[in-house]
Amino acid sequence: MAAPRFSFSLSTLALACMAAVPQTRADESDQPTTYSVTPSQMVQGGVGLWQTPTARMMPEGALSMSYTDNQEYRFMSVSLQLFPWMEATARYTDVRTRLYSNVADFSGDQTLKDKGLDVKFRLWEESYYLPDISVGFRDFGGTGFFESEFVNASKAVGPFDFHLGLGWGHLGYQNDITNPFCELRDSFCERPDGFSGRGGKVDYQNFFKGPMAVFGGVEYQTPLEGLSFKAEFEGNNYQQDRAGALEQDSRWNFGAVYRWNNFDFSLNYQRGNTIGFGVSYKLNMHTVSQVKIDNPPREIQGIKPPENAAAVNRQKLYNDLRRHGGYVITDLEIDDDQATFYGLQTRYRDRNEGVERVGRILASELPESIKQYHLVEQSNNVPMVDTVIDADTFREHATYSVPESNVEDTYRRVSPTQQQVDAYEPHRATGAFFSTKFFWTQTFGNPEDFYLYQIGLLSSVGYKFNEHLGIYGGIRTTLLDNFDKFNFTVDAEEAFLPRVRTRVREYVTGPMITLDTVFMQWSDRLADNWYYQGYGGYLETMFGGVGGEIMYRPIDSNFAFGVDINYVKQRDPDSTTAFMDYSAVTGFASAYYQPDFLPDTRIRASVGQFLAKDRGINIDFAKRFDSGIVVGAFASFTNVSSEEYGEGSFTKGFYVSVPLDLFILQPATGRGQFPWVPIARDGGQMLNRPVQLIGTTEMRSPFLD
C-alpha cells in the first residue's frame, strides 16, 4: 500500500513560522525552560535522535566527537556548539559497499570515504508554551551523500522530549507531504538527482527542493541516571543512498543511550533490520581546565620595602620577577617616583594574574616613593604595550584595604611613548639561540590510507645581530611517519593553475632531515600604532623569496589593518637549496575586526593575489572560548572557477588552537595549532610567511588570550 500523502499549503507553513516571531511572546511567564533529557548525538553527528536531527542544542562551547557503525556505513564526526544558537558538524563517512576508486594502484582496496559539513540554527528558544525551533542544512558543502534541509521543533514534557520536523532531500525521500514551495515556483517541485563528484561547493540551488517528508520522535529519560531511550519516525526511504538501495522494513528506529562521565554509549535498531552502535566523547571548551601546581601570589602585608631607589636589590628583583612572576626583564629604569621594566611575560597567559603577581613583587621590593610601575612588554625586541600600575591603588588592593577590590582597577594599558622606545636598550640584544619542539603533521581521507601522519622534531636556530636584525632557521627531523604510502606526485594532465600546492607530497616524502626555513628579518616600530618588517630567504617548505609587511594596530582596538607583498620562487623538492623556474608576486591587504555583536570572535578579510597568481579574497573566522581554546575556519574565493580549481571547488579549512597550559601542571604561555584542510588544491593558496605582524603585535590587542 502506498504511503499516504498530505497536503501542506503555504498558509499552513506561514502559521507554523509565526511561532518564531518575537512579538508572540506576550506573557512574561513565557520564559525559556529547562528540559530533563540531555541532548545526545545522532548517527551522522550533531544533536538528534538516530537518523534525524532535533531542534535541541548543546551548551555553548560543547564539543562532541563520535564514532558510529551502522552496517553499510561508519561515521566519524565532530560537532561543536559555536554559539548558543548555532551548531556545526564535520563528518567523515566510510561507505563499506563502495571502493575509493576502481584503480587498484591508486587506492588499493580502501573503501569509499566522504567528507560532509552540517549547520543548524535555532530560530526560537523553548519557553513555557512554545518549543525550540531550528532550521538546518546537512552535507551542504560536500558531495551530497546526505544533502538535506530541515525545520523542526522540540518540546520537553517532564522526562519526555518530543520532536517533530519537516525534511527535504535525504530527509524527505519518503515524499509523504506536498512541498509548499511548489506554489511559489515550479523549480522547487524537483530536486536534481545524484551526487556531486567535485564536492566542496554549496549547492544552494537545491535548498528546499523536491520531495518532502515528516519525521520526528521522542526521548525518555529513565529513573536510572544516565540511561535514556530514543524512538524516531524517519523520512528517508533509502533508495537513493550512496551505499546503494537499502532494504527498509520500517520507518521506525529505536535505541538506548547510556551516559557515563563524558562518554555516551548507544545501541540502536534501525530500518526494522539493522543493528548499530556508537560512542561519543564530550567536553566543554568554555570550562575545560587543568589543575595547576604553583605558589600563591606573594603576600605583602607586614613586608617593609626599601627606603629609596638606591637601596633596591636589583639582582633579587630580577630573579623574583622571573621565578615568581614569570616576567623576564630585558631592561630596567628606576627613578624617584616611577619604575619602568622592559620585558616579557613568559608564564601567565591570564593578563590579570600576571599583573597581580608582578605587582605584588614590585610593591614588596620597591620603595613607597615610587608611585607608578611601568611594565613595557616587547615582542621581537620591539616595545608593544605599557601596563601602567598605580602603586598606591595596587597596595590597597594587595593588602585587602578596599572591599571587593579588583586588580583590573589598579592598572591601565597604553601604547609606549616615543621616549620609552628610545630609552630601551635590551640586555643581550645580540647572540645565538636554539630551541627544539615536536611537530605532528596529519591528513585524513587520503586514497592511499585514510590516516597519514608525520611526527618529528623542529629545531630552530638563529642569531640576533642587534635588536632589529636577525637570521633564523628551522630543521625538520622526521622520527615516525607513514608518508611513504603517498603514491601520487603530478599527473600527466595539463593543469589550469601552476602546481603551487599539489606537489606537496614530493616535499614531505624526502630525506629524514630537511631544511625547512632559513631567512633574515628586520622588524621595528614605524610610529605610534604602526609596525613593519622585511624578510628574505627560504620562507617555507615550498617557497623562498623576499617580502615586507606593514601593520596598523592601535592598543586594545577591535580593528587592525596590514599590507604585505612578496616575490617568491618555488623550491626544488629534489634539492635542499635549489629553486624551480616558477615565480610569483603575492600579497594582501588584510583587515582584522573583533565585533562587539559577536563577543570573543575575530574576522579577517585579506584581498590580493595568491601563489598561483589568481586574485580574490581569503576570509578567516575565529571563535575563542573561556578556556583559551580557539576554533576557526577559513576560505578563499578567487577568479578561478570551481571547474578550473578541481576537486573541492575552492580552498577552505579549519583549525583548533589550544593553549599549552591545558596539558601541563605548571602555568605556561604558548599554543599548539591543529589544522584540517579537506582538499588542498592550487587555487586560493597563500604564502606561509614564517613571521606575521598580526602575531608579533598580538599583545597590542589580545585575542588569543
Regions found by a protein language model. Name each.
Residues 63-67, 78, 88-90, 119, ...:
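Membrane-embedded beta-strand positions of outer-membrane beta-barrel proteins
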Residues 59-63, 74, 84-86, 129-133, ...:
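Outer-envelope beta-barrel architecture signal
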Residues 90-118, 122, 136-140, 145-148, ...:
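Outer-membrane beta-barrel translocator/channel fold
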Residues 288-335:
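N-proximal, solvent-exposed amphipathic alpha-helical segments enriched in charged/polar residues
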Residues 65, 76-80, 117-121, 151-155, ...:
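Residues on the lipid-exposed face of transmembrane beta-strands in outer-membrane beta-barrel proteins
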Residues 298-304, 320-328, 370-433, 441, ...:
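Polar/charged, Gly/Pro-rich intrinsically disordered segments
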Residues 26-145, 157-158, 170, 202, ...:
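Transmembrane beta-barrel domains of Gram-negative outer membranes and organellar outer membranes
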